[in-house]
Amino acid sequence: RQMCIRDSLSTYKDFLDQQHYAEKFDSRSNLHSSVLEEFLYYLFKDLVGDFGENALIGKSHTFKDIFFVPPKYSEMLKRPYARIEKKDHDFVIGATIQVSFESAPPPEQDENPGEKVTLVKEEPENYTQVKVTGNTETHIFDIPVVAIECKTYLDKTMLEGSSRAAEDLKARNPNSLYIVVMEWIKLSSDVNLRKYKVDQIYVLRQQKNTDREYRYEEDYVKNPVNVAVVKHLFYKVRKHLTTDWSGGIEQGIKRGWLIDE
């Protein structure tokens, strides 16, 4: 299956890479990176579908942080005024979460400390809004378990940005996996990849980047997308999705090493 999807990607990209088409779009158009996003959807859709209809796959506006902005203290006692900061990701596998917040009396004053808050069933029109019912706020947002950044090529500045995004994601969701996928690489050999926070970098064509005009020369050889690289990506994501994340100190002691690999 991975080979069939790879072949479809290669055919589609060869069509778009023709000079009379490619010159109509610059790097800001995101045309070529969006092709990779679509490729990832078809690569993983059956795998993710096996987890059920609630599984999230595709481009997503995901949870980044939460903060509280009541206009004054007396209002904070009525409801929390929570705000969810979000971040765009090219491709994610994850879950959509609905949470409710409400202001409550301190535990020692609460006559029913074990009472559960009833979730509001009405969903906001979009993920940037909050549903307020009485003093209860309901928020909906996506949590990525796998986040994949799609690039035509990757240089050092881009890698630094990817590393910061990976660090932010893992601070909120330590069980997440952050991957960067590109066609070409534009990094020199003196770059130390171990200092960056991304979990893996995939170069689909296993080829250094060249300026676009050189790719139109007759003697330029463009490597095909390597199916072995695609398989490695697929198996890495599959392993992460099917691994038990509940390990801890006790299981680590039994192994003898605390951080599982």
Question: At which residue positions do the language-model features occur?
Answer:
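Active-site-proximal segments of catalytic enzyme domains
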Residues: 95, 114-142
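Short, small-residue-biased leader/transition segments that mark boundaries at the very start
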Residues: 1-5
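Domain-level recognition of nuclease-like catalytic cores that cleave nucleotide substrates
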Residues: 165-172, 179-261
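Short, flexible loop/turn elements at secondary-structure junctions
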Residues: 95-97, 151-154
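Short His-Asn-centered micro-motif
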Residues: 148-153, 180-184
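Conserved catalytic cores of phosphodiester-cleaving nucleases, focusing on short active-site segments
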Residues: 91, 144-152, 162
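Acidic-basic catalytic patches of nuclease active cores, encompassing PD-(D/E)XK
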Residues: 19-118
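Active-site-adjacent loop/helix micro-motif of nuclease/hydrolase catalytic cores
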Residues: 101-104, 153-164, 171, 189
